[in-house]
Regions:
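An acidic/histidine-cluster motif and surrounding catalytic segment
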Residues: 2-116, 120-251
């Protein structure tokens, strides 16, 4: 009887966490092959957050240091403002990684996905908070940012204090109980964000027509601000781990 009870409990618990992520088709994380430490970190965070393993998908990041960019890829970067910078190829690899995940989302007809950098730290009870956000997404939303740093500038960043929940005053203006309109001075750094299918389609059309202008994060920010749909979760759901450094601006 004890064994049956225990098995039932485990099954119920797994079902509960599955239900909390029911609206999310996939949670992608971007990870360089040469950074197994970051891969281990991310999977450990997912384990602690009880994220169902079948929802998690690793996307092997395009390594700008070694990747051979095709002509049809290079044309997307003809107007970028970081041309000639020492980190140019690294940003290009990162930007295409996000871009190709959007393409996969559309090809697979996913309604909602989450894209994460591999250094994220999830808030306690992450799935409960995420479920509230998923049930509150505005009808015109294309991206909803859920991950933020307290401060970030190139390779230097400070993690958000995830023990607090009074985040709205730093982020922006209330839209509903779980979503806010972000201030245009906020940079989520493309750390962790929800994408809607409509958003992925619109972004791909935009990038195909105009290409990229800035690095991944600011390209998103400018696009969303222009359309007045710069959304974020009212409570920060995850932040970055400073001890893992930056794959783009680090050595």
């Amino acid at each position: 009887m004890i064994r049956k009870s225990k098995l039932y409990y485990i099954t119920f618990k797994d079902l509960y966490f599955k239900i909390l992520m029911d609206k999310v088709d996939k949670l992608y994380y971007i990870n360089l092959k040469r950074r197994p430490d970051r891969n281990d970190h991310f999977l450990n965070e997912c384990l602690k957050a009880n994220i169902p393993t079948h929802k998690i998908k690793r996307f092997e990041a395009l390594d700008g240091l070694t990747y051979n960019f095709e002509d049809d890829e290079l044309i997307l970067f003809k107007n970028v403002d970081y041309r000639g910078k020492s980190f140019e190829n690294k940003i290009m690899g990162n930007q295409l990684s996000h871009y190709y995940i959007l393409k996969e989302m559309v090809e697979k007809h996913y309604n909602y996905i989450i894209i994460c950098q591999d250094d994220v730290i999830f808030r306690d009870n992450f799935l409960t908070y995420l479920n509230r956000v998923m049930n509150s997404i505005p009808i015109d939303a294309e991206i909803v940012n859920i991950g933020f740093h307290e401060f970030a500038s190139y390779e230097h960043f400070v993690a958000w204090d995830l023990t607090k929940t009074n985040d709205l005053e730093k982020l922006g203006q209330k839209y509903n109980d779980n979503i806010c309109k972000l201030n245009n001075t906020v940079n989520p750094c493309s750390l962790a964000y929800i994408v809607t299918l409509k958003g992925a389609i619109n972004l791909l059309v935009f990038f195909k027509k105009y290409g990229f202008f800035r690095a991944t994060d600011w390209n998103y920010n400018d696009y969303l601000n222009y359309k007045n749909i710069f959304y974020g979760s009212s409570i920060v759901l995850c932040t970055g781990n400073p001890s893992l450094g930056s794959d783009i601006f680090g050595k």
